[in-house]
Amino acid sequence: WIMGHMVNKIEQINEFLDLGANSIEVDITFDNLGYAEYTYHGFPCDCKRWCTNQENVKEYLNALSDITTPGNPKFRKEQTLVVFDLKTGGIDANRMYEGGKDFAGKILFDYWKGSENAGRAYIIISVPSIDHYKFMKGFRERFDGSAFKDLLLEKVGWDFSGNDDLDATRTAYQNAGIEALNHIWQSDGITNCIPRGLGRVNKAVSNRDSSDAFINKVYVWTVEKYSSVKDALSADVDGIMTNHPNVINGVLKEDEFKDRFKLATYEDNPWTTFKR
């Protein structure tokens, strides 16, 4: 999966798809009560990127639904997966659970349109700290008893993006009521302004490939330097988040990688584990 990074303006969705992305990451900000407000990253962000692009969350989700609904004139089959990078740090601790429930409602009614026939992209709910596991718990439990619980079970996956200890991350999922290997992506990364080694990535890949795994897939962010892309692919990651999807596509076509990797399509299930 080639994940376009920080795609916070509606018009940027097609821009990143045209560059070769098959998935996008969008930042979501919240007020202190846990209500999602804007697609916004803010300062600091990546080098050579504009940090202040934003949209109203409802308007963005509606536009994203159009782009991922077959039969809609705006439909783009390339858009298979969405990573919602949820800026939960400003939510009051006692409102984290309610924030998760509210955002689930926005996905249900603004993205899925209260229907099983709209917004087909798979979704990763990405939370920046294992201490915010109650957001995931609230999101999940919003669908308890719902006619749309099958959509949750089919379409939604999970990620803690704060580079936390992996054993502690496993415990956080248990606290959130999410079982091991239940659509879990593990991210690792840092801004493109600073180099980062692959030590934790290698540990995550080892967990993914082990008999005691809790991780289904591993992705790195934010990567676009040619040598860093090659290093990430050599580490057998499943996804790369990037500002330059065309660079990733170019490396994938090289002899070293063209028979080891393929660009994911909608028919490729993002919850299925592929081991080395």
From Swiss-Prot:
It is found in: Secreted. This is Dermonecrotic toxin LlSicTox-alphaIV1ii. Binds 1 Mg(2+) ion per subunit. GO terms for molecular function: lyase activity; metal ion binding; phosphoric diester hydrolase activity; toxin activity. It comes from Loxosceles laeta. Dermonecrotic toxins cleave the phosphodiester linkage between the phosphate and headgroup of certain phospholipids (sphingolipid and lysolipid substrates), forming an alcohol (often choline) and a cyclic phosphate. This toxin acts on sphingomyelin (SM). It may also act on ceramide phosphoethanolamine (CPE), lysophosphatidylcholine (LPC) and lysophosphatidylethanolamine (LPE), but not on lysophosphatidylserine (LPS), and lysophosphatidylglycerol (LPG). It acts by transphosphatidylation, releasing exclusively cyclic phosphate products as second products. Disulfide bonds join 45-51, 47-193. Keywords: Cytolysis, Dermonecrotic toxin, Disulfide bond, Hemolysis, Lipid degradation, Lipid metabolism, Lyase, Magnesium, Metal-binding, Secreted, Toxin. GO terms for biological process: killing of cells of another organism; lipid catabolic process. It is an enzyme of class 4 (lyase).
